[in-house]
Structures are given as C-alpha cells and as structure tokens.
A protein has these predicted regions:
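Carbohydrate-interacting regions of secretory-pathway proteins
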Residues: 1-177
C-alpha cells in the first residue's frame, strides 16, 4: 500500500484473495498503468487481471494462479474473459459470440451464437484484430484511458452470469460460470 492505494507494480507476481466466498457481487477496480515495466514483460503489453470465482489452491493453474474466470486487464485487451482452469467442465464459460473466431479466439457479440469454452479466451467486443503483445499497444477502438489516467473496471456476478464493464461500457459477458 502506497499513499492509501494498493500498488501492484508487476515486479513480482501476486494476488489479493478474500477469506469469504461470494455468490452475487460487484467488484469495482480503479486502475492506471505506470511507466515502469519489469521482466519477463519488460517490452510486452502491460498485463494484469482480476480472477473471479476462484477456488482450489494457490498455484492450482500453471503453478501460479487459482482456477478461476479471469477478467483480463491488459493493454489493448482489457475486458477479455479467460478460463483459468484444468480444461474440465468445472471451469467453463459460455458467451454469445461472433460467427467466426479472430486469431483463434471467440469475440463477444450480445446478439451472437452461444459458445462454451473450458480454456482460452473470449475477447471483448472491439478488441483490435491486429493486437500484438507489445508495450504501449493501443487499438483504434480501445476504451481504456491514456497511459497514466485512471480507468474503472466493474465485474458484476449475478447467479451464473459475469458482466464486465470498462469505464461504464459493457464490453463482455459470460454465463454458465
């Protein structure tokens, strides 16, 4: 904690975990990107995330994270939904998506067809199709504010649905989670 704010620099990986379990909740996170970056992502897009519906042990996924549904916070891809799990039905998400994948990933479309994933991602509706994992990447339709400015991500979980809002705009939604 610095100056009354939680600071996550990226120098070390870590998490904040609740002691209690929650069914229906609204998690609001205000964030801004700092200028300094660290290995192994020194020259790559600034990257973070919020793990929702986490369960199991720390390190259960890839030796680092708890199994969960992630709201991605990454330059150019904030609001993507990732399934961070073991590939089983226990960790899955269904979303309405565009008819075709883009760069191997589904893209959220409110009026699209239902698709269920047990791993991988569902990109937010306007993620740049030319996204690259490069420091400072910014897509032409990004809703994130400029580097150093505050952004608000809201993760709303009601029953079996998670809705993701970035700066007040619904960018992604999944159900059967």
């Amino acid at each position: 904690v610095e100056h009354g704010q939680i600071r996550i620099s990226g120098e070390e990986w870590g998490c904040i975990t609740t002691n209690e379990s929650y069914d229906n909740y609204k998690l609001v996170v205000e964030f801004k990107w700092g200028g300094q970056t660290f290995d192994p992502r020194k020259d790559r897009a600034r990257d973070s995330g919020v793990l929702l519906h986490s369960n199991g042990k720390d390190g259960g996924y890839s030796g680092t994270w708890m199994n969960s549904i992630e709201c991605q916070i990454i330059e150019g891809g904030t609001g993507d939904i990732l399934v961070v799990g073991d590939g089983s039905e226990t960790y899955s998400a269904t979303a309405n998506v565009a008819p075709e994948k883009v760069n191997g990933a589904y893209v959220y479309r409110p009026d699209g067809q239902a698709a269920t994933i047990n791993g991988g991602r569902i990109n937010w509706y306007a993620r740049d199709t030319n996204w690259i994992d490069q420091l400072g990447f910014r897509g032409k339709n990004d809703l994130e504010n400029q580097l150093g400015e505050w952004n608000t991500i809201e993760c709303v979980a009601v029953d079996d649905k998670i809705s993701i809002f970035l700066n007040g705009i619904l960018v992604n939604e999944a159900y059967n989670v």
